[in-house]
């Protein structure tokens, strides 16, 4: 589905989002951090609060990025050409899950900055035409949130029913209430609370107790959180693990054949949908046209599609199946076909994402090949839908190699969270003063950094910039309809159309050149090629029907 003449077109359909993991983007103001934590200027933040993982060194705290580091690089993001930023959590947190365990939804953690720092970042982003969405973590809080501290103190506590509690089995008190498994490490999704002699549910770490969204007071309280950030001017929310909010109150066992899979990857309960309709109605009433983007980690497009509702639930839902494709045409053809068959009929606008803070970077998944990463960039930014870029993919970064003694995440996600290198200096543009960053810099940082690649007209960074400029210029690519074409086994071919504009996205997944062009196409002009210098298809020239090894192009009917 594409835009009809005269139809209002929401800003988030035309935008490219840039995902920033604040810990890993840039450290700019270490002195401000020490001041916020009340420490001498020559002392690190160790011991001020638990801003890392038990046993991790002070680098996890001292070497983390901050909000000021994001603000100072806003001009670079404008130069790159993205339209909106998504910020992973920066809220007050013990950091057991690096901010996804929230102790205060409305406060900025001093590790990252102050409330004034956030407001300045938001205002200066808006001044540059960049919208900003923030993470909303509604399934669970930190066990240090005042609600849970109160809830665990007594069965009669005011906030007791904000969480999910169950009595122990009278015949086997050591057996959890059901067989659900938690994410991040081995073990049940239940912890026994000795003080009140009941189990509480946590689909993730024991330090992340699940909220009970069947309680209207929880819905009201979390709606107030959304209102707080909307009042401050944010442009929407990425909603964490949104499919897990509604739960069967009977809490039945997982079927035996999937019992070993964490329940957070299985929960798909109809009770979530009324919650989303309530939140959507609330968000839609705000004048900045906020967007809701849901993390629906169910790995089937048919399941993801349900969370759009009848255009009354999520505005956008992350569709992760393409992220699990190897670098092969057949898998991506199937994913494109599913998206068009399942989302287009219900006018649900797709998303496209290949990397994020929870999965290995796609260049790493594709065998470390920059050629493949460049082709993937053309595909990602050429498909119908809203693309999400993960900071650093425009540099062609691979996952960092993190030795055992430096590992901080028990979930194995450290590699994709390596700090962004801004230049070729020893600290790569971070204000580290010779200290270590919270994680090692990624491979090749000495030459694969922003300053070096920005000066190279043939770099992958310049390719991303050219692709983003192309999206702004070509209506067919930005918001046109999509049609999957018949093509050779190793070629993905998608026709994009918007009124009189017609483009084709062609991706050769083979390591050999292929001669092929869209059937019955008239003269075609090459708009962009992933191959750079020496490409068989030179931008600005006629398309001769030849694709180089693992080359992707976007061509337009002349």
Can you name each region flagged by the protein language model?
Residues 27, 93-94, 140-142, 187, ...:
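Flexible loop/turn segments at secondary-structure boundaries
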Residues 85, 237-239:
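Hydrophobic residues within beta-strands of alpha/beta enzymes
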């Amino acid at each position: 589905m594409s835009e009809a003449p005269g139809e209002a077109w929401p800003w988030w359909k035309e935008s490219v989002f840039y995902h920033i993991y604040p810990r890993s983007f840039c450290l700019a103001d270490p002195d401000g951090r020490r001041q916020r934590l009340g420490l001498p200027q020559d002392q690190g933040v160790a011991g001020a609060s638990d801003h890392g993982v038990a046993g991790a060194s002070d680098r996890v705290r001292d070497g983390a990025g901050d909000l000021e580091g994001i603000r100072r690089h806003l001009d670079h993001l404008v130069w790159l050409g993205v339209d909106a930023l998504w910020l992973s959590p920066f809220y007050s947190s013990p950091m057991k899950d690096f901010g996804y365990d929230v102790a205060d939804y409305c406060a900025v953690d001093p590790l990252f900055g102050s409330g004034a720092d956030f407001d300045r970042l938001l205002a200066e982003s808006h001044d540059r035409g960049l919208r900003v969405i923030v993470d909303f973590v509604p399934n669970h809080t930190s066990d240090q949130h005042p609600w849970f501290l109160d809830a665990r103190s007594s069965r009669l506590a005011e906030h007791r029913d904000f969480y999910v509690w169950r009595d122990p089995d009278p015949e086997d008190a050591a057996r959890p209430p059901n067989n659900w498994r938690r994410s991040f490490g081995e073990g049940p999704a239940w912890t026994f609370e000795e003080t009140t002699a009941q189990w509480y549910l946590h689909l993730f770490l024991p330090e992340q107790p699940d909220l009970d969204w069947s309680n209207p007071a929880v819905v009201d309280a979390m709606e107030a959180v959304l209102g707080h950030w909307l009042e401050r001017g944010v442009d929407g929310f990425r909603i964490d693990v949104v499919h897990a909010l509604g739960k069967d109150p009977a809490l039945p066992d997982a079927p035996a054949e999937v019992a070993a899979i964490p329940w957070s990857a299985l929960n798909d309960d109809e009770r979530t949908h009324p919650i989303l309709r309530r939140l959507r109605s609330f968000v839609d009433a705000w004048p900045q046209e906020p967007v809701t983007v849901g993390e629906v980690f169910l790995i089937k497009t048919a399941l993801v599609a349900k969370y759009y509702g009848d255009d009354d639930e999520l505005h956008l839902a992350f569709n992760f199946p393409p992220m699990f494709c190897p670098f092969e045409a057949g898998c991506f053809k199937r994913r494109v076909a599913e998206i068009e068959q399942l989302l287009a009929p219900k006018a649900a606008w797709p998303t496209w994402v290949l990397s994020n803070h929870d999965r290995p970077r796609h260049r790493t998944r594709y065998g470390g090949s920059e050629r493949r990463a460049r082709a993937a960039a053309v595909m990602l930014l050429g498909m119908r839908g809203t693309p999400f870029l993960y900071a650093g993919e425009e540099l062609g970064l691979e996952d960092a190699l993190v030795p055992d003694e430096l590992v901080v995440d028990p979930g194995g996600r450290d590699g994709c969270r390596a700090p962004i290198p801004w230049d070729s200096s020893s600290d790569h543009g971070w204000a580290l003063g010779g200290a270590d960053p919270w994680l090692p810099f990624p491979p090749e940082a000495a030459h694969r950094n922003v300053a070096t690649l920005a000066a190279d007209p043939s770099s992958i960074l310049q390719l991303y910039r050219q692709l983003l400029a192309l999206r702004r210029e070509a209506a067919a690519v930005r918001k046109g309809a999509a049609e999957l074409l018949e093509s050779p086994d190793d070629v993905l071919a998608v026709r994009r159309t918007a009124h009189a504009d017609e483009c084709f996205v062609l991706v050769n997944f083979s390591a050999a050149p292929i001669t092929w062009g869209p059937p019955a196409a008239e003269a075609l002009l090459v708009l962009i090629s992933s191959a750079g210098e020496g490409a068989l298809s030179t931008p600005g020239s006629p398309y001769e029907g030849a694709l180089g090894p693992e080359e992707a192009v976007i061509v337009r009917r002349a």
